[in-house]
């Protein structure tokens, strides 16, 4: 099940990048730019994210959930999702896999959460037949994307607080093929609980500021750099292996 949540995490806000009809492009860009600016300008912002999965025909019957915590200060981000911790600072993106006792180290990789419109212009010609709609009610703005057949996502709905620009909820209607093992799928009324179409909801809550310092993003708590291509885990992570994913390290 984690594979689905990680797929959604990777795709979060990136799915806002496909081509739009010409008359909707500006409105969608403005919507996403509001989100981008809100998170880019936030100082020491933290919040909670709850992921819930349900089958298409029972959207209120959640069969799996995961929760995460995000802390960010402009382009510095820490994301904790169960046993995986990811930190991005000016020098590294650090991914700590606690169950595997592995520290995965690479050059800084900016998340789509901090730059949700970065890929829009370069992807404008990728898809055709995608429709968009923006609605506003009660201080909330909702962007709905309906994708053409043949893609992993059917629909994506994003709701933001119009005053702050912060995400409140993101809903993905998606196909689960390739994300769920065969023995987990419902087949003729038997087998696992997962169907061929599902829904993932991400609910953002508990927004707060000033609860941490820049030390939260420091690589020094995970490792010591001994020289080019040489890193040693700190005492806390002494039984972890460090994997270097970039020759530039």
What are these regions, as identified by a protein language model?
Residues 1-4:
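Positively charged n-region of N-terminal signal peptides that target proteins for export
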Residues 7-16:
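Bacterial N-terminal signal peptides
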Residues 19-61, 230-249:
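N-terminal leader/targeting segments and the immediate start of mature chains
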Residues 49-51, 78-82, 142-149:
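Short beta-strand segments that buttress and anchor functional surface loops
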Residues 63-66, 81-82, 89-90, 152-157, ...:
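Short, surface-exposed coil-to-beta transition loops
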Residues 69-117:
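An acidic-aromatic
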Residues 119-179, 244, 248:
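Extended beta-strand-rich segments in extracellular/periplasmic secretory proteins, especially
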Residues 164-249:
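Non-transmembrane domains of secretory- and envelope-associated proteins
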């Amino acid at each position: 099940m984690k594979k689905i949540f990680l797929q959604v995490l990777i795709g979060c806000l990136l799915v806002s990048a496909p081509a739009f009809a010409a008359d909707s492009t500006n409105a969608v860009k403005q919507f996403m730019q509001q989100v981008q600016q809100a998170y880019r300008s936030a100082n020491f912002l933290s919040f909670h994210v709850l992921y819930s999965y349900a089958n298409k025909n029972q959207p209120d019957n959640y069969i799996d959930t995961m929760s995460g915590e995000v802390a960010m200060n402009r382009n510095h981000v820490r994301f904790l999702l169960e046993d995986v911790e990811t930190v991005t600072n000016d020098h590294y993106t650090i991914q700590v896999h606690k169950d595997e006792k592995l520290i995965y180290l690479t050059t800084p990789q900016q998340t789509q959460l901090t730059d949700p419109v970065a890929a829009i212009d370069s992807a404008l010609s990728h898809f055709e037949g995608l429709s968009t709609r923006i609605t506003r009610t009660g201080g909330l703005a909702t962007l709905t994307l309906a994708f053409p057949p043949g893609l992993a996502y059917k629909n994506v709905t994003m709701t933001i607080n119009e005053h702050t620009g912060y995400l409140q909820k993101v809903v993905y209607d998606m196909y689960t093929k390739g994300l769920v093992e065969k023995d987990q799928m419902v087949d003729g009324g038997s087998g696992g609980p997962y169907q061929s179409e599902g829904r993932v909801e991400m609910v953002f809550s508990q927004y707060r500021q000033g609860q941490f310092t820049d030390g939260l993003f420091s690589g020094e708590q995970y490792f010591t750099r001994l020289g080019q291509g040489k890193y040693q885990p700190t005492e806390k992570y002494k039984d972890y292996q460090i994997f270097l994913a970039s020759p530039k390290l």
